[in-house]
């Protein structure tokens, strides 16, 4: 076969005969061939849940089918679009399409074909970020430069960045657009120093028209990489090239980020994305169902949208889980079936009531302090500091009064509790180790 896409399409036709229609529609139909390297065929699955299911339930069947077609024993590897964006694409059609990139020693733009402005669902939480992204795509380096988009995981930051890239290339096929994560930027920079190819690295990223860099917060604490990105930023900005940056937090909240970088990130426009509201979540589910060719009852979409309000990735994953569950037990989808399918991933609707004793036990576990020491008169730092953390969390996570908290810590005065709360609050603004420990305690208490 000339092209691995042809090979995979032939394999899909055979697989369609071997599995039930619901199974084929749910798991196999939306897969695509990514590349074939050293007898390993990489297949792209639409999401993590589908990838994991394919790996555990269909790898052997797929290998057998491919052997029947080719006579070769191929190993099968599954990836999702996000991880695909970090790899080199080997499809001949793609190589030919981007020949101009290779001639300039530039990386592939690595854009996910599913992440466009047309597939982006607009809601109150992302409307401004969408408008800003579209403005940048329509007039690179003229509207907002840089554009800094921040928000939680799975809310659409990466989608908007890819959409910008697609739009620019569609309207200017010769534009040099590069998307990468800050982690990849860091790794390539380190390798360039090791291999004495620093000049090649700089030329690679300072000669693009649009640079889309994801998860910039991972540059925190990496002084040399920040230095390199600072100069890359300057070179692109001075040449009026567009820079788009994403992060899980605004520039001012990224710890150990150099002030000069923080200042430059604030030169253009900073916009955030917040979790989608109910109407937007329903719209996202409808668009996902339509894209996957799934017929989902309204009551099921409403149930999922009401239960999953954290991010889009979990929302779409829940939908796929319900569809899979329905096909496996061979029952029609309804709200009751959705509840059964999602019972292990939906948080308990009754929030856990945290007690001061719970907090003392959790802090004691992290800091190796015995429960009785929280009430004792010991003032050694190894006990006193964890005790202050426990007082702080008791104030933050319970409804207990100051005197009540003091009483639970060996009858201490309420002013001691106030002092502990103020001290820990102040330290949390700068002490990353303390931040980590407090989050660890909170995770234990969940």
From Swiss-Prot:
It is found in: Cytoplasm. It comes from the Bacteria. Residues 81-109 are annotated as: Domain II. GO terms for molecular function: ATP binding; ATP hydrolysis activity; DNA replication origin binding; lipid binding. Residues 327-446 are annotated as: Domain IV, binds dsDNA. ATP binds at residues 154, 156-158. Keywords: ATP-binding, Cytoplasm, DNA replication, DNA-binding, Lipid-binding, Nucleotide-binding. Residues 110-326 are annotated as: Domain III, AAA+ region. Domain I is involved in oligomerization and binding regulators, domain II is flexibile and of varying length in different bacteria, domain III forms the AAA+ region, while domain IV binds dsDNA. Plays an essential role in the initiation and regulation of chromosomal replication. ATP-DnaA binds to the origin of replication (oriC) to initiate formation of the DNA replication initiation complex once per cell cycle. Binds the DnaA box (a 9 base pair repeat at the origin) and separates the double-stranded (ds)DNA. Forms a right-handed helical filament on oriC DNA; dsDNA binds to the exterior of the filament while single-stranded (ss)DNA is stabiized in the filament's interior. Oligomerizes as a right-handed, spiral filament on DNA at oriC. HAMAP family: DnaA_bact. Belongs to the DnaA family. This is Chromosomal replication initiator protein DnaA. The lineage of its organism: Bacteria, Bacillati, Bacillota, Bacilli, Bacillales. The gene is dnaA.
């Amino acid at each position: 076969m000339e092209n691995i896409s042809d090979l995979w399409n032939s394999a899909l036709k055979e697989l369609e005969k071997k599995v039930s229609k619901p199974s084929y529609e749910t798991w196999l139909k939306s897969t695509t061939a990514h590349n074939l390297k050293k007898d390993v065929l990489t297949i792209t699955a639409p999401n993590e849940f589908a990838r994991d299911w394919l790996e555990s339930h269909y790898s052997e069947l797929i290998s057998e089918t491919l052997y029947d077609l080719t006579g070769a024993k191929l190993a099968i590897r599954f990836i999702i679009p996000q991880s695909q964006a970090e790899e080199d694409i080997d499809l001949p059609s793609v190589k030919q399409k981007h020949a101009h990139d290779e001639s300039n020693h530039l990386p592939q733009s690595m854009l996910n074909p599913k992440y466009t402005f047309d597939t982006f669902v607009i809601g109150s939480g992302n409307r401004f970020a969408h408008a800003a992204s579209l403005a940048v795509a329509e007039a690179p380096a003229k509207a907002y430069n840089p554009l800094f988009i921040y928000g939680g995981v799975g809310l659409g930051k990466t989608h908007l960045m890819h959409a910008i890239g697609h739009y620019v290339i569609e309207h200017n096929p010769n534009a040099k657009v590069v998307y990468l994560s800050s982690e990849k930027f860091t790794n390539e920079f380190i390798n360039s120093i090791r291999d004495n190819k620093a000049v090649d690295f700089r030329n690679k990223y300072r000669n693009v028209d649009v640079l889309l860099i994801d998860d910039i917060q991972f540059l925190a604490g990496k002084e040399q990489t920040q230095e390199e990105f600072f100069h890359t930023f300057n070179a692109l900005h001075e040449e009026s090239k567009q820079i788009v940056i994403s992060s899980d937090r605004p520039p001012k909240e990224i710890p150990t980020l150099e002030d000069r970088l923080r200042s430059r990130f604030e030169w253009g426009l900073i916009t955030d994305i917040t979790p989608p509201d109910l109407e937007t979540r329903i719209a996202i589910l409808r668009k996902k169902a339509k894209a996957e060719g799934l017929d989902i009852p309204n009551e099921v979409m409403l149930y999922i949208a009401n239960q999953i309000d954290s991010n889009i990735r979990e929302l779409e994953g829940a939908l796929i889980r319900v569809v899979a569950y329905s096909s496996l037990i061979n029952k029609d989808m309804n709200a009751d079936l959705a509840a059964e399918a999602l019972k292990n991933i939906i948080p308990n609707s009754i929030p856990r009531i945290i007690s001061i004793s719970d907090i003392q036990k959790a802090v004691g576990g992290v800091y190796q302090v015995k429960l009785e020491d929280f009430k004792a008169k010991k003032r050694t730092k190894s006990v006193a500091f964890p005790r202050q953390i426990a007082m702080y969390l008791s104030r933050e996570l319970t409804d207990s009064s100051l005197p009540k908290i003091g009483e639970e810590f060996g009858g201490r005065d309420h002013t001691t509790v106030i002092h502990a709360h103020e001290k820990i609050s102040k330290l949390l603004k700068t002490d990353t180790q303390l931040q980590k420990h407090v989050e660890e305690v909170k995770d234990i208490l969940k």
